[in-house]
Curated annotation (Swiss-Prot):
UniProt-recorded name of the protein: ATP-dependent Clp protease ATP-binding subunit ClpX
InterPro entries: AAA+_ATPase, ATP-dep_Clp_protease_ClpX, ATPase_AAA_core, Clp_ATPase_C, Clp_protease_ATP-bd_su_ClpX, ClpX_bact, P-loop_NTPase, Znf_CppX_C4
Residue ranges annotated for the ClpX-type ZB domain, each copy included: 2-56
SMART domains in the record: AAA, ClpB_D2-small, zf-C4_ClpX
Subunit structure of this chain's protein: Component of the ClpX-ClpP complex. Forms a hexameric ring that, in the presence of ATP, binds to fourteen ClpP subunits assembled into a disk-like structure with a central cavity, resembling the structure of eukaryotic proteasomes.
The species this protein was found in: Enterobacter sp. (strain 638)
GO biological process: cell division; proteolysis involved in protein catabolic process
Binding site for Zn(2+): 15, 18, 37, 40
Domain of life: Bacteria
Pfam families, sorted: AAA_2, ClpB_D2-small, zf-C4_ClpX
Length: 424
């Protein structure tokens, strides 16, 4: 590097790019028979920065998966629920397309489309939201609506949701503003009755009111690094209009509200259309006919429903669907336990009748896919406890009798003569 000095021959040095002498610039950087001044270095940096800004949006746009690609990715992890996947794929694609192209297109302001998922426990609502966030590589956080209260009351403030999202991305505001928030048990904050009450409902309608602005879009002031709020503190400003909110709930009893509306429309008394019990719609079919007026009768306020324009309904999982969930997805439960046993150098086999028994047990418990893990865990608990202390075990076999609790898993040892059933 040369700094305002002549070379060994006493010759004056010049920048090879702009032609300025060493006396006209602060620094000259020497290369093989060439020199560049600090001003030209700054200019090069500016040019590169501008090019990066121009190229970045195009890269982002090309990186956004299409609705078909989103649906295909969901298929790898979530069994069934095809209508819900389609609705989610379109809604998520449109949301991130709006972010990547600005909030306006040709002067038309693009509205925000948050999502409401309605379906029974264990039908895949949370898994769908998590899978979407993983595909899009955006921060994701979950909140339980039952713990939320209005500001000033004992409980969790709604702005804590944004704080959790910031924690997921090390308080990077730009990343957080592209994240996904899933609010579970949203049906539990329904109004206690159809008519507005003069008494304060801090965990029901009050929470809906508090969530309105957050979901629609506001600038939330969040204390940095999870500190408590106080007047002298500088807050992080997070624009929630760019955050995708997905609300989910079981909405137990909503099918009866819909059924009443549908059946009332078909007439009553002598002019009514009489339907046999077998002809009446099941819960899944009824939920797919949900209208805003049904949600209002259930206890959600009209303003809150208006902030969740995209509604997707999920059906209760059938026995066949539960069997598929056990073995087909990329992170299927049986594959997870097989990987766990492989770490001990042991193979794990689930017989087909065992999978059927697990699914039947989950159907009886009415826990959906969520209950599958606890059933498998209970069946394998003793084996997982003993296995690390045992030698020469090559394989563990799970059949129907193991799931029903009649026998323990079959342990197959390396030496044929040592083959025996555990616990015999």
């Amino acid at each position: 590097m040369t700094d305002k000095r002549k070379d060994g021959s006493g010759k004056l040095l010049y920048c090879s790019f702009c032609g300025k002498s060493q006396h006209e610039v602060r620094k000259l950087i020497a290369g093989p028979s060439v020199y560049i001044c600090d001003e030209c270095v700054d200019l090069c940096n500016d040019i590169i920065r501008e090019e990066i800004k121009e190229v970045a949006p195009h890269r982002e746009r090309s990186a956004l998966p299409t609705p078909h690609e989103i649906r295909h990715h969901l298929d790898d992890y979530v069994i069934g629920q095809e209508p819900a996947k389609k609705v989610l794929a379109v809604a998520v694609y449109n949301h991130y397309k709006r972010l990547r192209n600005g909030d306006t297109s040709n002067g038309v302001e693009l509205g925000k489309s948050n999502i409401l998922l309605i379906g029974p426990t264990g039908s895949g609502k949370t898994l769908l939201a998590e899978t979407l966030a993983r595909l899009l590589d955006v921060p994701f956080t979950m909140a339980d609506a039952t713990t939320l209260t209005e500001a000033g009351y004992v409980g969790e403030d709604v702005e804590n949701i944004i704080q959790k999202l910031l924690q997921k991305c090390d308080y990077d505001v730009q990343k957080a503003q592209r994240g996904i928030v899933y609010i579970d048990e949203i049906d539990k904050i329904s109004r206690k009755s159809d008519n507005p009450s003069i008494t304060r409902d801090v965990s029901g309608e009050g929470v809906q009111q508090a969530l309105l602005k957050l979901i629609e879009g506001t600038v939330a002031a969040v204390p940095p690094q999870g500190g408590r709020k106080h007047p002298q503190q500088e807050f992080l400003q997070v624009d929630t209009s760019k955050i995708l909110f997905i609300c989910g709930g079981a909405f137990a009893g909503l099918d009866k509200v819909i059924s009443h509306r549908v059946e009332t429309g078909s007439g009553i008394g002598f002019g009514a259309t009489v339907k046999a019990k077998s002809e009446k719609a099941n819960e899944g079919e009824l939920l797919s006919q949900v209208e805003p007026e049904d949600l209002i009768k259930f206890g959600l306020i009209p303003e809150f429903i208006g902030r969740l324009p995209v509604v997707a309904t999920l059906n209760e999982l059938s026995e066949d669907a539960l069997i598929q969930i056990l073995k087909e997805p990329k992170n299927a439960l049986t594959k997870q336990y097989q990987a766990l046993f492989n770490l001990e150098g042991v193979d794990l086999e689930f017989r087909d009748e065992a999978l059927i028994a697990i699914a039947k047990k989950a159907m009886i418990r009415k826990t959906g896919a969520r209950g599958l893990r606890s059933i498998v865990e209970a069946a394998l608990l003793d084996t997982m406890y003993d296995l690390p202390s045992m030698e020469d075990v090559e394989k563990v076999v799970i059949d129907e009798a193991v799931i029903s609790g009649q026998t323990k898993p079959l342990l197959i040892y390396g030496k044929p003569e040592a083959q025996q059933a555990s616990g015999e």
